[in-house]
Amino acid sequence: MSYQPQTEAATSRFLNVEEAGKTLRIHFNDCGQGDETVVLLHGSGPGATGWANFSRNIDPLVEAGYRVILLDCPGWGKSDSVVNSGSRSDLNARILKSVVDQLDIAKIHLLGNSMGGHSSVAFTLKWPERVGKLVLMGGGTGGMSLFTPMPTEGIKRLNQLYRQPTIENLKLMMDIFVFDTSDLTDALFEARLNNMLSRRDHLENFVKSLEANPKQFPDFGPRLAEIKAQTLIVWGRNDRFVPMDAGLRLLSGIAGSELHIFRDCGHWAQWEHADAFNQLVLNFLARP
């Protein structure tokens, strides 16, 4: 039987998660039926979702025999909105823990982009026995850069878009999000804008969260040596959101890690270089 591509609608699921005395309705997509599970965690951009972030990576993983879970973190996509005054990544890690517990999944491989990478590190530090392998793209440490003034140009534009969610500000952010802007079609802009504006509560609560705690993503650098999982670090040479030296910091701190840098690539390696990225990840996951 020929492979049937996954669809967002057919794989859409919801679970209730208890967090800080409240019940949050959390959305995720559940794809494939493999013995090993790969969880994909998206970044923090306005309008981001698990499906939108990894649309070019889902089918190759499922075809290779993996079960794939795409989480909409609280405050994004179809999940409930929150005002968060603590560590955003620790919150995401707790939510993910509850989801995989309810799904009765003992161990997961984690693949995270930007905020998703930072949240993957948070999960691994808290529950190392639940993690197989780690793939960290354009995020994972927090902290300062040795070479780039912080906040970066990209983060400034991201925060501006949250405060003023217009098509003009979306294009300003996306223009430096990727290296080659020729793939940024009007249809992509329209879909992302619709995602943003359909959940204004997410936008407003992200701004409120920043006001409550400007440091949503703490510096995990001093604890990286605790990570024992085999780790693939992936960066874009031209990333203007999270500087490349953050990847070097991960490489230095995590003993069982390796770093792959894509040239002519911005903050979205899994999308900009999808074919090469997918093969890189599949080879990494298949290794003993």
UniProtKB/Swiss-Prot annotation:
The keyword Heme does not apply. Changing R192K: 40-fold and 5-fold decrease in catalytic activity and affinity, respectively. Changing H118A: More than 2-fold decrease in catalytic efficiency and 3-fold increase affinity. The record marks R192 as: Catalytic role in ketonization of the dienol substrate (substrate destabilization). The keyword Hydrolase applies. The active site is at H267 (proton acceptor). It comes from the Bacteria. Signal peptide: none annotated. GO terms for biological process: 3-(3-hydroxy)phenylpropionate catabolic process; 3-phenylpropionate catabolic process. GO terms for molecular function: 2-hydroxy-6-oxonona-2,4,7-trienedioate hydrolase activity; 2-hydroxy-6-oxonona-2,4-dienedioate hydrolase activity; hydrolase activity; protein homodimerization activity. The record marks S114 as: Transition state stabilizer. Pathway: Aromatic compound metabolism; 3-phenylpropanoate degradation. InterPro entries: AB_hydrolase_1 (IPR000073), AB_hydrolase_fold (IPR029058), Epox_hydrolase-like (IPR000639), MhpC_alpha/beta_hydrolase (IPR023791). PANTHER family: ALPHA_BETA-HYDROLASES SUPERFAMILY PROTEIN (PTHR43689:SF8), HYDROLASE (PTHR43689). Homodimer. Belongs to the AB hydrolase superfamily. MhpC family. This is 2-hydroxy-6-oxononadienedioate/2-hydroxy-6-oxononatrienedioate hydrolase. It comes from Escherichia coli (strain K12).
